[in-house]
């Protein structure tokens, strides 16, 4: 398994100029079974009505599950997303910060399945997301 999760500051710095940085996503915890990150509900992640955009929520879910799978992979492997689906249960409003908690459901040789729950700052469940990642050998 990779020790990438031990370098959260480095991961957050690298993400600054990618989708994660554009959405304000910050990793806050990571180990081989769980990854957590936060994302602000602001002009970058909200709908015109001032609530969290479902697409931004799914991007947050895929981000934490992707890091989780990277942690589980060997140095000669890469991870790509295969499937993301989510149920949006309640809303988060502009000015809040949501927290994603990804937990591993299946650690297979060629695929990983993650459950990601997204909460408001008051621990209200916003979305429940399922992510399937494919594990492949580097070419």
Regions from the PLM with identified roles:
Residues 55-75:
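Active-site helix/loop of acyl-thioester processing domains in fatty-acid/polyketide metabolism
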Residues 1-5:
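Short, small-residue-biased leader/transition segments that mark boundaries at the very start
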Residues 22, 34-36, 83, 97-99, ...:
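Intrinsic-disorder/low-complexity, polar/charged segments enriched in Ser/Thr/Lys/Arg/Asp/Glu/Gln
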Residues 22-52:
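Catalytic strand-loop segment that frames the active site of acyl-thioester-processing enzymes
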Residues 39, 61, 116, 129:
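Conserved GNAT-family N-acetyltransferase fold
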Residues 106, 133-135:
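A short acidic/small-residue loop/turn micro-motif
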Residues 78, 89-115, 119-128:
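Beta-rich strand-turn-strand
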């Amino acid at each position: 398994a990779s020790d990438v999760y031990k370098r959260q500051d480095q991961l957050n710095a690298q993400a600054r100029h990618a989708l994660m940085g554009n959405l304000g996503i910050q990793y806050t915890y990571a180990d081989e079974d769980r990854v957590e990150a936060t994302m602000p509900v602001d002009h970058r992640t909200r709908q015109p009505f001032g609530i969290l955009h479902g697409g931004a929520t799914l991007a947050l879910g895929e981000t934490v599950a992707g890091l989780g799978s990277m942690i589980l992979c060997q140095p000669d492997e890469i991870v790509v997303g295969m499937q993301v689906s989510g149920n949006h249960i309640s809303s988060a409003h502009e000015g809040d910060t949501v927290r994603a908690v990804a937990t591993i459901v299946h650690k297979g040789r060629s695929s990983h399945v993650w459950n990601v729950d997204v909460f408001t700052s008051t621990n209200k469940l916003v979305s429940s997301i399922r992510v399937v990642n494919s594990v492949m050998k580097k070419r």
